[in-house]
């Protein structure tokens, strides 16, 4: 079931959307036209999921150059949804825009609820009768900003969706089911069955230390869900155009003006029976170029999108030099340790430029580019777009492959035999055991005798060895260490 939230600008649609979804997904600001594209969220209640669509404010009299596209996006959401919420400002009474929207929505013959928002006081509630003239019989007064009567709206939605209310017994059963079972726990390879790096036997103290650490490093099984892919880049490089070209529909509003996209827009798409969620983000700009609070919130949400995505697609403009902002985004992606692909958009404008020479030169411009996959594409001409899916799938397969503990130990044991650690104060680094701890982020855990015996050059040597052995050139990964506790002196 899908619910579309519609209304003229600045009536509190995004505030209501955030309340229903119980997350701050949409930017809320007193500036009209803050929301432009369709935003998707979820109501998770009654052991069910209801999809919610937030839309931009519809005002046919507005001179905003985006208004036509906002209007089209809102009507598309109304067609897509099975239940409609028309949001009005109870303090303003019925406006011409409210009347026009009601006339548009009533003929759709879908359940339609009039949400009289901003009913913050008893005096506001006395104006309910004014809205009977819209011809909508299902009416609820709310205050999204103060969380008033949202429960009544949710109950009405439940009734329309015909979702039964779970009994007390069923709720208790659900809570018990959420507890992890012994069968669901993921156990590591038994410590006793693995070959240690050195032939010398462990002391009882070392064996107890290692066995306890291994028991604490169980890794949860991967979640079966759509792959999240965020398109990141500075304004006006064509992020929204790429999504529209991939989906073959005008899903995101595009314009030549930087800053057109403000919210992070999640767009679900299925390709070759694989599910993806593309996250269209606002362009990151230099701090001094951010002119208002809406742009500041958009930029902060771009960083949040990087933190929650599985793979980043950094979009750059082929006609421009790699900018300071591009390099800043690359460092941000590296900081969050996200696998990434670089999309060089607007390649149709690069007349007479050899692609391989361009890619070689691009790799020299920033160390964070490294061995990242680089695709030269054209959203306008739909050139090389299908390569995006293969690049995403290839890197995600590597990034989510759980490596065998036995294989990790053999690779590191071989590395230590080829190049022994240096002796420091009469002692040498020992690696007792190693595991592939997690895939998100990709992390190896090494159990060692002492952190003080691990030098930076040797750590880099181990990291390069693992990178080559497991083809991790395009997957950021970390090495973590657990050192044996120092002996207590008597």
Swiss-Prot record:
Residues 401-485 form the KH-like domain. PROSITE patterns: G_ENGA. The keyword Nucleotide-binding applies. Keywords: GTP-binding, Nucleotide-binding, Repeat, Ribosome biogenesis. GTP 2 binds at residues 233-240, 280-284, 345-348. GTP 1 binds at residues 7-14, 54-58, 117-120. One of its GO terms (biological process) is ribosome biogenesis. One of its GO terms (molecular function) is ribosome binding. Residues 1-165, 227-400 form the EngA-type G domain. Belongs to the TRAFAC class TrmE-Era-EngA-EngB-Septin-like GTPase superfamily. EngA (Der) GTPase family. Associates with the 50S ribosomal subunit. GTPase that plays an essential role in the late steps of ribosome biogenesis. This is GTPase Der. The gene is der.
């Amino acid at each position: 079931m899908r619910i579309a939230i519609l209304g003229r600008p600045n009536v509190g649609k995004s505030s209501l959307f955030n309340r229903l979804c119980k997350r701050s997904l949409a930017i809320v600001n007193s500036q009209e036209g803050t929301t432009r594209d369709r935003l998707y969220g979820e109501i998770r209640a009654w052991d069910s999921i209801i999809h919610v669509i937030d839309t931009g404010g519809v005002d046919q009299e507005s001179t905003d150059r985006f208004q036509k596209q906002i209007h089209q996006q809102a009507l598309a959401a109304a067609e897509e949804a099975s239940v409609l919420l028309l949001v009005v400002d109870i303090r303003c009474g019925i406006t011409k825009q409210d009347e026009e929207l009601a006339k548009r929505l009533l003929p759709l013959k879908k359940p339609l609820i009039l949400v009289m928002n901003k009913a913050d006081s008893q005096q506001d509630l006395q104006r309910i009768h004014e809205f009977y003239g819209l011809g909508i019989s299902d009416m609820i007064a709310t205050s999204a900003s103060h969380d008033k009567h949202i429960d009544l709206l949710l109950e009405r939605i439940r009734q329309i969706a015909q979702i039964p209310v779970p009994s007390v017994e069923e709720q208790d059963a659900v809570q018990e089911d959420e507890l992890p079972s012994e069968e669901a726990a993921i156990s590591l390879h038994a410590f006793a069955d693995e070959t240690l790096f050195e032939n010398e036997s462990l002391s009882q103290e070392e064996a107890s230390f290692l066995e306890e650490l291994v028991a604490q490093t169980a890794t949860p099984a991967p979640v079966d869900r759509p792959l999240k892919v965020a398109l990141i880049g500075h304004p006006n490089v064509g992020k929204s155009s790429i999504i529209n070209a991939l989906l073959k529909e005008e899903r995101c509003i595009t314009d030549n003006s930087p800053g057109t996209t403000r919210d992070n827009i999640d767009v679900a798409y299925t390709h070759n029976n694989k599910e993806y969620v593309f996250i269209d983000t606002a362009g990151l700009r230099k701090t001094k170029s951010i002119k208002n609070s809406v742009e500041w919130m958009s930029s902060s949400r771009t960083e949040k999108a990087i933190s929650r995505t599985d793979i980043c697609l950094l979009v750059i403009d082929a006609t421009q030099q790699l900018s300071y902002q591009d390099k800043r985004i690359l460092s941000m992606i590296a900081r969050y340790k996200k696998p990434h692909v670089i999309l060089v958009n607007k390649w149709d404008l690069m007349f007479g430029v050899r692609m391989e020479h361009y890619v070689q030169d691009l790799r020299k411009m920033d160390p964070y580019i490294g061995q990242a996959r680089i695709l030269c594409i054209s959203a306008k001409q739909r050139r090389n777009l299908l390569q995006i899916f293969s690049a995403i799938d290839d890197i995600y397969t590597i990034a989510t492959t759980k490596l065998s503990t036995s294989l990790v130990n053999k690779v590191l044991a071989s590395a230590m035999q080829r190049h022994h650690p240096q002796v420091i104060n009469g002692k040498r680094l020992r690696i007792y055991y190693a595991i592939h701890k997690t895939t998100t982020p990709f992390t190896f855990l090494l159990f060692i005798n002492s952190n003080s015996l691990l030098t930076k050059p040797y750590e880099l040597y181990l990291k390069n060895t693992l990178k080559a052995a497991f083809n991790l050139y395009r997957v950021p990964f970390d090495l973590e260490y657990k050192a044996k506790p120092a002996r207590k002196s008597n």
